[in-house]
Amino acid sequence: ARKHFNNEEYDIIRIPNNPFSRVVIPEYIRKRKSLPIDAIKRIRDARFDNPRTAMARDVFMMLFYLMGINMKDFFSLANETYGRVEYRRSKETTIDNKSYVPLSVRVEPELRPLLDYYSNGTFLSYFRMRYTDYNNFLKAVNKELKLVSKQLGLGVQLSTNWARHSWASIATKNAGIGKADVDFCLGHVNNDFKMADIYIDIDYSICDKANRAVLDLLKKNE
């Protein structure tokens, strides 16, 4: 408004003061969506009468076992290759910058029975046979995860994002994994080294060790 009504070049000042000078815009603080180890174990071990709720819990645990893979990438998984799940993180894949982030996750023993259960001839075909697209799948799973949280008394609005945040938090705080390695496992692009990454072979053993360390924490005091 001041730019519209004022013209400092001709000393025309119709609005002398800035009405927003005392307005303080609060800093955006991202809400934490991480669960402690005990809560993850409770989700894993819970029994649900409703098969849809049990399915949502299984999806949550698969996301966690796959180092916090996001739901869009999970729904798009097509196969398993020599005991590994490989994909390119869709969030960082753009036509403009070609920032493809290839990830490879070793199938750990905790994940194996779930993959087998939901693969009927074709890898994870169970979900694609029942849900027409990713958005319907996401909506259905998140709806049931709210019931999981309510039944277990977790006190949070549980959603699929919590699997990713929880894996990262446990890896850093409990498993002692360095932040740089956690970022690598999550598929975060490092713009400072993007060109160097083109020429460097990716060492996924970093991910294997980190994920194994996190999953081993779920086995303690069982």
Each model region followed by its residue ranges:
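Short, polar N-cap/turn motifs at the start of nucleic acid-interacting alpha helices
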Residues: 80-86, 155-156, 176-198, 219-222
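Basic, Lys/Arg- and aromatic-enriched nucleic-acid-binding interface segment
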Residues: 12-18, 22-71
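Short, leucine-enriched amphipathic alpha-helices that occur as contiguous helical runs
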Residues: 55-57, 138, 142, 164-165
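Short, charged phosphate-coordinating catalytic segments
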Residues: 2-11, 63-84, 180
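Active-site/catalytic core of tyrosine-dependent DNA strand-transfer enzymes
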Residues: 40, 106-155
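C-terminal catalytic core of tyrosine-transesterase DNA break-rejoin enzymes
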Residues: 61, 65, 69-72, 162-188
